[in-house]
Amino acid sequence: YITLEEELELIGRYLAIQEVRFGDRFVCELDVDERFQHCVVPKLILQPLVENAIIHGVADSDEGFIKLWAEEDVEGYLLLKVSDNGSGIPPEVLERLNSHELIPGGHLGLNNVDRIVRLSYGESCGLSAYPNEGGGSCVQLRLPMQKGEDHAQGTDR
């Protein structure tokens, strides 16, 4: 486990590699408020979501846009969201993702992220996805809001 701040640094490095590969065919905006930076997340949990947004969302576009941001839901959970303006996730895949079923023939990264989160934190956490109004998709992770100090205390038991 690492802080969200550290995870975002890893995402920045991953995006630098993708910028070499894709040039200026997409832009990625990271918009995570300071109050979430010290939350603890599983290491490399966001990379598959960003990779999925690039490969399935904007790789075939000349004007791709990806946004990653964090929110707190009404129950106090951390929501990490990755949105793109691509062609969107097919409805049958959305249905399987949102019911936490394995998706045959692809989306292995999303399945793995969902399983890691659900095994680590329980059934109230995990991955969900939905279409964006203007096109594209948004994939959301729901995690407990644990600060680095809280997590360290919890693992000393």
Predicted regions located by residue number:
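Two-component histidine phosphotransfer core
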Residues: 1-130, 136-138
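Gram-positive cell-envelope targeting signals
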Residues: 151-155
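Charged/polar, low-hydrophobicity segments characteristic of intrinsically disordered regions
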Residues: 89, 146-150
